[in-house]
Amino acid sequence: MNNDRRFGLKRHITLPGELALDGGSLLTGIEIAYETYGHLNADASNAILICHPLTADQFAASDHPITGKPGWWSRMIGKGKPIDPERYCIICSNVLGSCLGSTGPSSFTPGTETPYAMNFPVITIRDMVRAQAKLLDYLGIRQLKAVIGGSMGGMQALEWASTYPDRVKSVVIIASTARHSAQNIAFHEVGRQAIMADPKWRQGNYYEEKDPPVAGLAVARMAAHITYLSESGLTARFGRRLQSRQEKSFGFDADFQIESYLRHQGIRFVERFDANSYLYITRATDYFDLAEEHGGKLANAFRGTKSRFCVISFDSDWLYPTSESRVIVHALNAAGAAVSFMELSNPNGHDSFLLDAPDLHRTVHGFLEGDRA
């Protein structure tokens, strides 16, 4: 497959035909941006799909073209690492609705040079997965050795197991949930309202002016980023320490290190992400409820599955706490699925799966080694 131009870095495909969305709309001319690492073997049996979290992208193990930083999961993917491109063909695509090359609100409507903006249809996690399935068809991959995802990526992995059970041999769900809770929805709504309250949002029509609502998007990111951390981690890293000063300013600059850190996170984020995409993708996660899709009983989503599952949580994650993972495990047990579960200890909260987490790496490696077929 070395000379097959379908595989490699910075790849694009226009999906053939139409994609019917859960909301009732039809999308045509869908662009999907993706990357692959490693080579597909002769019988196409070594493919692993990586599903990215909320605001990540297809650059899982290559330098980001905007920030120049290493891939968001380069700790997990690479030579000698748990997901090794010398053994596997690894695929990661930018989700439908995003802004790093796949069709989303910043894309032109077919046959025009006018962005969709808020005319883009509301999408779901299942819509994202349907688009990924079409990508795999194009790549000639009938069945995945594994689908792996953390956070929103875990939602996609669950949806893969439910919607395309015959196409997935193994499923790894990390720091995720089978449905968004009221608290999760609440935090997302704060972020969306911050964006829409920014005068530069202009009802989503800010592309022509090239003056996006960066202030609102930065605040949305700051609010969300808090949920990715843990109280113990914040205390250990920042405490109440002041930022570059000996005394409080008695003003509203960033007196505390944590304030400066959050502002920095917001500024960095707006350099690489689109505000409207943030609205659409957070809405997709809020709509996610796998049990609701199957008559209100989560076990029904996995009935008859032959896939192996590995569910992993972190003890400091309060965005998707271990209790959410246990719900998934109980449903898989009720469905008679083969499932292993690990709660890992890590002080870094929800973001633990993106950071140095040796226990996570050992767990994923061991699970993949358990299926050598």
Curated annotation (Swiss-Prot):
Positions annotated to bind substrate: R221, D351
Location, primary (coarse class): cytoplasm
Enzyme class: transferase
GO CC aspect terms: cytoplasm
Gene Ontology molecular-function annotations: homoserine O-acetyltransferase activity
BP-aspect Gene Ontology terms: homoserine metabolic process; methionine biosynthetic process
Active-site residues, Swiss-Prot/TrEMBL: S151 (nucleophile), D317, H350
Subcellular location: Cytoplasm
Disulfide bonds: none
Keywords, in A-Z order: Acyltransferase, Amino-acid biosynthesis, Cytoplasm, Methionine biosynthesis, Transferase
EC numbers for this chain: 2.3.1.31
Functional pathway: Amino-acid biosynthesis; L-methionine biosynthesis via de novo pathway; O-acetyl-L-homoserine from L-homoserine: step 1/1
Assembly mode: Homodimer.
Family according to the record: Belongs to the AB hydrolase superfamily. MetX family.
Protein name per the record: Homoserine O-acetyltransferase
Organism for this UniProt entry: Zymomonas mobilis subsp. mobilis (strain ATCC 31821 / ZM4 / CP4)
Gene (UniProt): metXA
